[in-house]
Amino acid sequence: MPTLLFRSPSDPATAWTTALRRHDAGLDVRVWPATGAVEDIEYALIWASPDGFLHDLPALRVVFSLGAGVDHLMGSEVPEGVELVRMVDPALTEGMIEYVAYQVLRRHRHMADYERQQTGAEWRIHSQTRPGERRVGLLGLGELGSACARTLSGLGFDVAGWARSSHEIPGVTAVSGSDGLDWLLGRSDIVICLLPLTEATRGILNGQLFQRMSPGSTLINAARGQHLVEDDLLIALGEGRLGHAVLDAFQEEPLPPGHAFWRHPHITVTPHIASLTNPDTGAEAVARGIHADQAGEPIPHRVDRGRGY
């Protein structure tokens, strides 16, 4: 009987253990700190390893991340020789599609302007632009980025995407390299960051990048707070280089009450809720991974530690 250890400071243990047992009745699920005999534990489903406890599990084979990102597990937290698997959950993808499409449509149709006008009883109609005339650029064309790109293209937007390697996505202009990035930034009315957090992408949303963006454009960061140089964003907004920013992730979370972002008229703050892992569909993905490993087959969505995703 395979044994899995669940540990998370915020995800509901009962919901996850119930779902895991439903998708694999033969799985022995344990919840930290009730580990039982640690030499039995082959699998771990966690958000982080703050105290290095994974190194105390001698039979550990695979660590499943509770989130789509694995940047928090890329140091020495996961022992050498142990597979690291990122979460690819249909509900997680659906949630990101909803968030990104909503924020793009909100900017596209001037909804924030109309809400402000209502507070002052101001009847003013803004011009409407057809979706095909609104250029949207995505940074990152992984599982989430590609899904969002396809959805936005299906809504009629002029969509381009940039990634480290070349991609082919119907209805989307996919580019790579520094020239491709320059082209995407300069032509996009809305730029969406869905990049994985690696040493190469840490701080990528900075003053130099903002200078290359179309004047007055909108930035949506639904990836990691560490992608963004916060002071550079405030400068870019103050100078009018950017028109608005929608931020779902931050350097420090929860965002401190006194932080400038909360009350900035050109920043929309959401509390890292763009997409949340669903226990039922997430547990199904984990069960599939365990079944594959037990059968001696490759586990889907394994992380390349050299690339960081």
Place the predicted regions along the sequence by residue.
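Rossmann-like adenosine-cofactor binding region
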Residues: 165-260
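Phosphate/diphosphate ligand-binding glycine-rich loop within oxidoreductases
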Residues: 42-115
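N-terminal glycine-/charge-rich "phosphate-binding" loop or analogous flexible N-terminal tail
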Residues: 1-43
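C-terminal helix-to-coil terminal segments
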Residues: 83-87, 91-96, 113-114, 253-309
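Phosphate-coordination loops involved in phosphoryl transfer and adenosine-cofactor binding
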Residues: 1, 81, 132-135, 216
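Glycine-rich NAD(P)-binding loop of Rossmann-like domains
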Residues: 114-147, 174
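Short acidic low-complexity segments
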Residues: 29-40, 51-54, 171-187
